[in-house]
């Protein structure tokens, strides 16, 4: 469910229509709007729907779920859990970098797996990015992921 600011709800109908029709955020751009900054980079895949790659809201950075797509190509890095997890972590790293952060700033992640049997393999690849003080985390097995991905990971990071 979308959240609309109170000021936008009070705006004339034409302004609300113009807001809805606004062009998508340009790539490699940080845009300030309504107290938040949209973070976007072409070094990670474009969002598959009406959401941002990441949002800065004060010091927290919220990175949307990443799947193993190769940026600019729209295809998976491979068919294996290893290939897709490596690409997920590359995509997440690119978004963190665009926002001025890195994996050491990540405080929480959520991992979605198409098959819980991949838990150990994902942990090995994931753990290489967090060798000390890993973030809090939840992991779930789900029925289906976007584009039939094998893994999706989102994160929250803290910015200095």
Where are these regions (language model features)?
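Short, polar/acidic, helix-capping and beta-turn segments at strand->helix junctions
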Residues: 2-160
């Amino acid at each position: 469910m979308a959240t609309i600011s109170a000021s936008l709800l009070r705006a004339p109908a034409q302004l609300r229509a113009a807001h809805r029709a606004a062009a998508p955020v340009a790539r490699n751009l940080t845009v300030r709007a309504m107290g938040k900054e949209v973070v976007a980079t072409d070094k990670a895949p474009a969002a598959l729907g009406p959401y941002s790659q990441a949002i800065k809201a004060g010091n927290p950075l919220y990175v949307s779920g990443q799947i193993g797509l190769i940026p600019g190509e729209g295809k998976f890095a491979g068919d294996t859990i290893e290939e897709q997890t490596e690409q997920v972590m590359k995509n997440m790293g690119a978004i963190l970098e665009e926002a001025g952060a890195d994996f050491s700033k990540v405080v929480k992640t959520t991992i979605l797996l198409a098959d819980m049997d991949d838990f150990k393999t994902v942990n090995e690849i994931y753990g290489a990015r967090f060798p000390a003080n890993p973030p809090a985390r939840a992991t779930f097995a789900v029925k289906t992921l976007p584009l039939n991905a094998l893994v999706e990971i989102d994160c929250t990071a803290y910015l200095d």
